[in-house]
Amino acid sequence: MPVNLKGRSLDSLLNFTTEEVQHLIDLSIDLKKAKYQGLHINNRPLVGKNIAILFQKDSTRTRCAFEVAASDLGAGVTYIGPSGSNMGKKESIEDTAKVLGRFYDGIEFRGFAQSDVDALVKYSGVPVWNGLTDDEHPTQIIADFMTMKEKFGNLKNKKIVFIGDYKNNVGVSTMIGAAFNGMHVVMCGPDNYKNEIDKNVLAKCIELFKRNGGSLRFSTDKILAAQDADVIYTDVWVSLGEPFELFDKRIGELKNFQVDMNMIKAAKNDVIFLHCLPAFHDDHTSFSKEVATTLGAKYPIVAKGEMEVTDEVFQSLHNKAFDQAENRMHSIKAIILSTIGY
C-alpha cells in the first residue's frame, strides 16, 4: 500500500505505523544513492519552500544535516539558535508557533520538553520535526536503522544491544526503532534504569514486538548481552545541558557498561558499533580532559578520557558512527520530502 506522509509531523515515532517507518528508512537509502549519482543537482522539488530549524540545544550534526538536506531539495533554511528566539521566555510557544507557521512550510525543533514539540505541532499548522527532546530522538533513529539496513539488509530478527544510559532519549528511541523492525533488543545497564522508562512507551513497544516479531529484554551483564549481537550501540553518559557535576554519579553507575573489545569479541564477527556522537573515546576534548583529571584517580576506567567506549573500539573497523552521522542528512532529507514535498 502506498505511503503518504504529506502534512504529517514527526513528533514521535510512536505516532507512525510500521509501514510508514519502513518507508522513511527505504526512502533515505534511495535518496542517498541519488545523491551519490549526482541526481539531486537537477531535481529540487522543494524550490519555493522554506523551513525553520529552531534550536534550544546546539548540535553540529542535526543543524548541518537539515541545512544540507533542505539545500539539496531546493528549500530555503532559517536557523534560529538558543539566543535567537524568545520562545517560552517573552513569547509563548503557542504564539511563536503561530508566527513561524505563517512564514515557513515546516519547522524543526531541537530542545528539552516534548510538550514544546506538541505545542508547535498543535499551533503552527505546518509539519514539525522533532530534532531531539528529553523523551525521544526520532530523526536520529531513522538514520540509525538506515545504517543498519545498509549493512545487513532485512533487519528482522537481528540483535541489537543498547548499553549504558538506556533510559535516555536515544536508548528509548532505539527500543522503539527495534520494535518497528522486528529486532531483538537488549537494554544493558543498571537494573533500576528500566524503572525510569515511561510505562506507556514500554507498553506500546511490547505491543509492536508482538505484531512485528523480535523481543525486548534487560541485562546487567555486558558480555552476556553482547553474545551473538549484530549491533552494539551506546551514547554519552551525561547529555548536553546536564551539569558537569553529574559525571561523578553517572560514571559510578555506568563504569561497568563501557563498550570495549571484550564486548566486541563476544558479539558476531561482523558486529557494528554505533554512536550518535559526539563520543568520549579519548582525551582530545576539554570535557574529557577535565573528567580524566578530576575523576581519573577515583574511576581508572576514565583516566585516559575514555568513557562510554574505548578508543580501541572507536578506531576499529567495527565503528560505523561516521556512516551513521552522514546518514542523518539523507534520512532528514527523506523526512522533509515526505512531509512537505509529495
UniProtKB/Swiss-Prot annotation:
Record: residues binding carbamoyl phosphate: S59, T60, R61, T62, S83, R110, H137, P138, T139, Q140, C276, L277, R328
Keyword Oxidoreductase: no
Catalytic reaction annotation: carbamoyl phosphate + L-ornithine = L-citrulline + phosphate + H(+)
Alphabetic keyword roster: Arginine metabolism, Cytoplasm, Transferase
Binding residue positions for L-ornithine: N169, D235, S239, L240
UniProt GO BP: arginine biosynthetic process via ornithine; arginine catabolic process to ornithine; citrulline biosynthetic process
Pathway, per record: Amino-acid degradation; L-arginine degradation via ADI pathway; carbamoyl phosphate from L-arginine: step 2/2
Superkingdom in the source lineage: Bacteria
Alphabetical list of Gene3D superfamilies matching this protein: Aspartate/ornithine carbamoyltransferase
GO molecular function term, any single one: amino acid binding
Subcellular location: Cytoplasm
GO cellular component: cytoplasm
Enzyme Commission code: 2.1.3.3
Oligomeric and partner information: Dodecamer (tetramer of trimers).
NCBIfam families: orni_carb_tr
Family that this chain belongs to: Belongs to the aspartate/ornithine carbamoyltransferase superfamily. OTCase family.
Described function: nvolved in the catabolism of arginine. Catalyzes the phosphorolysis of citrulline, the reverse reaction of the biosynthetic one, yielding ornithine and carbamoyl phosphate which serve to generate ATP from ADP.
Family annotation (PANTHER family): ORNITHINE CARBAMOYLTRANSFERASE, CATABOLIC, ORNITHINE CARBAMOYLTRANSFERASE, MITOCHONDRIAL
Protein name: Ornithine carbamoyltransferase, catabolic
Organism: Malacoplasma penetrans (strain HF-2)
Lineage per the UniProt record: Bacteria, Bacillati, Mycoplasmatota, Mycoplasmoidales, Mycoplasmoidaceae
Gene that this sequence comes from: arcB
